[in-house]
Amino acid sequence: MAISQELKASLVKKYGGNSNNTGKVEVQIAILSAEIESLTKHIVANKKDQISKRGLFQKVSKRRSLLSYLKNTDIVRYRQILKDLDIRGN
């Protein structure tokens, strides 16, 4: 499911530095993580919703590729975003 505009704006401000920096990798990862969390709750409640499940897999894949890019370019920012969003224990 979609996340609210207020949540998205707060994530952009927190991870982007200002409200206009939406292209920063950390911002994109944070927004995808919020959308993944929302979709996960939806899929638990609606087990037969295959279209939403496919959307979830696409978002997870996109986040994985952005995390891989960040890991290869700046390991410090990569570790910080993992810790902030509690994504995985690397």
From Swiss-Prot:
GO terms for biological process: translation. It comes from the Bacteria. The keyword ATP-binding does not apply. One of its GO terms (molecular function) is structural constituent of ribosome. Belongs to the universal ribosomal protein uS15 family. The keyword Cytoplasm does not apply. Pfam families: Ribosomal_S15 (PF00312). One of its GO terms (cellular component) is cytosolic small ribosomal subunit. Keywords: Ribonucleoprotein, Ribosomal protein, RNA-binding, rRNA-binding. Part of the 30S ribosomal subunit. Forms a bridge to the 50S subunit in the 70S ribosome, contacting the 23S rRNA. It comes from Malacoplasma penetrans (strain HF-2) (Mycoplasma penetrans). One of the primary rRNA binding proteins, it binds directly to 16S rRNA where it helps nucleate assembly of the platform of the 30S subunit by binding and bridging several RNA helices of the 16S rRNA. This is Small ribosomal subunit protein uS15. Disulfide bonds: none annotated.
